[in-house]
């Protein structure tokens, strides 16, 4: 089964919400995140590198107001990619996905616009 590698670089978030931030300048077909990561106690930033296309996707999730300098490796399979893409699509078109809402962030320094899905 096809898998992608994801590296969690650091963790910093508010205590009451978790968010997933997607850099929409990247090809959505290569977007991936492991849903089980939501079970981890400290997650803030995940970089996913697709070596075949040389693309890098930056995601953000978290649960705690903590800063942890640590790294973990995740394996992400195609089923998990499709599940998270369905969640994002459902939220984006306004379908009910309990506990989630869509937000658009101010363009970053490099001019890309981020889409943020807040998990409350």
Language model feature labels by segment:
Residues 1-120:
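Positively charged, low-complexity terminal tracts
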């Amino acid at each position: 089964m096809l898998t992608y590698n994801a590296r969690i670089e650091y963790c910093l978030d508010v205590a009451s919400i978790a968010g997933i931030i997607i850099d929409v300048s990247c090809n959505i077909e290569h977007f991936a995140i492991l849903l089980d990561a939501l079970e981890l106690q400290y997650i803030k930033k995940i970089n996913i590198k697709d070596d075949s296309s040389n693309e890098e996707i930056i995601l953000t999730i978290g649960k705690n107001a903590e800063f942890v300098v640590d790294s973990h490796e995740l394996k992400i399979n195609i089923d998990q990619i499709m599940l998270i893409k369905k969640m994002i699509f459902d939220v984006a078109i306004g379908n009910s996905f309990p506990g989630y809402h869509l937000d658009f962030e101010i363009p970053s320094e490099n001019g890309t616009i981020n889409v943020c899905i807040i998990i409350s």
